Amino acid sequence: MAHEPIPFSFLRNLLAELDASEHEVLRFLCRDVAPASKTAEDALRALQRRRLLTLSSMAELLCALRRFDVLKVRFGMTRECAGRLLGHGFLSQYRLQVAAINNMVGSEDLRVMCLCAGKLLPPSCTPRCLVDLVSALEDAGAISPQDVSVLVTLLHAVCRYDLSVALSAVAHGHMTVGVGTPVQDEPMDVLEVDDAEPMEATPACDEIGVVKLAGAASAGAPLADGAFAACTSAGKGEDLATSDLTDSEPEDSVFAVADPVYADVDLSMFVRANATADSSMFVNADAGADSSLVNADAGADSSLVNADAGADSSLVNAVADANSSLMRTTSACTDSEPEDSAGPSCAGMALSMFGRAKSVSSLLLRTKASY
């Protein structure tokens, strides 16, 4: 029953279920038996006249098209059952291979292959798939089942070496293509990375104030600007210095200062004033026209005096107290110190002159006693 001819009326309904590309593949598969056929219907008619259109050959054609659904609906045959009928038809391994790689070549690759073929193709030839291109090259005599060198070259032009190798092996009889089994792409070489050797760790500097000392001679070597840093060894003998930065330091400061550093201040801007027995007065006179404001907080028994010294001096702050004694002080102030730092205490300073002060630290001048 597998070798009995199939009525053509039955095949017309079968062809209606195939699309245009499958018609082209079906016609290409029958070219060895019906080379002059122009359509799939003509190819099947030629097979029927030669009594080659049997159930086994039809199962082989549908398996090559991978239409197992049609095979089951029209013939009631499963894929496993159809596999037992294969290998007894008229299909060559070369045509089965080309049909298998037909869907693996995209439209862009097909366009490049047509351009590379050049004058081998007729001017009016516009292939829509790979089997159309192969059929046109066969008509031109450039390709045959025994000579596929031109097709291999075209596949190399689009870097499809996997398809060209499989096609060459089939053409030379070194490989057999199973019907309905497309050629799988060869796996690409994977670069293996040896993870046994750990990567070299890089010392991380996550905290602010950790700097790399490129030219440090030793761990205890003094740094520039009188700053001191603690040097530790990390990584490959690299020296790291950690500095204790505070919020009171300016942002451009890198190294912390161990002790307060007092810059040389021109003391000519301060005037030593002598107070009488009845009152004591501190006078800070600035020689420039633009001087700063000095605010003194006075209690109930003290008087606040803000006097303008004129064009050459800015403000005079005097705190008077009838019971205060004479006191002379010389101060040196640095503007670089923070306001919340009182600095060294002034020796021998009597605070009774300030009366009931709300905050002593707010009234003290930022001074350093000179001895």
Curated annotation (Swiss-Prot):
Domain DED: 6-76, 93-169
Entry superkingdom: Viruses
Protein name in UniProt: Protein MC160
Gene3D superfamilies: Death Domain, Fas (1.10.533.10)
The entry's keywords: Host-virus interaction, Inhibition of host NF-kappa-B by virus
Biological process, per Gene Ontology: regulation of apoptotic process; symbiont-mediated suppression of host apoptosis; symbiont-mediated suppression of host NF-kappaB cascade
Lineage of the organism: Viruses, Varidnaviria, Bamfordvirae, Nucleocytoviricota, Pokkesviricetes
Entry annotated with the keyword Repressor: no
Free-text function comment from the UniProt entry: Plays a role in inhibition of host innate immune response. Reduces TNF-alpha-mediated NF-kappa-B activation. Interferes with IKK kinase activity and reduces the phosphorylation of both components CHUK/IKKA and IKBKB/IKKB.
Gene from which this protein is expressed: MC160
SMART domains (alphabetical): DED (SM00031)
Subunit and partners: Interacts (via C-terminus) with host HSP90AA1. Interacts (via N-terminus) with host CASP8. Interacts with host FADD.
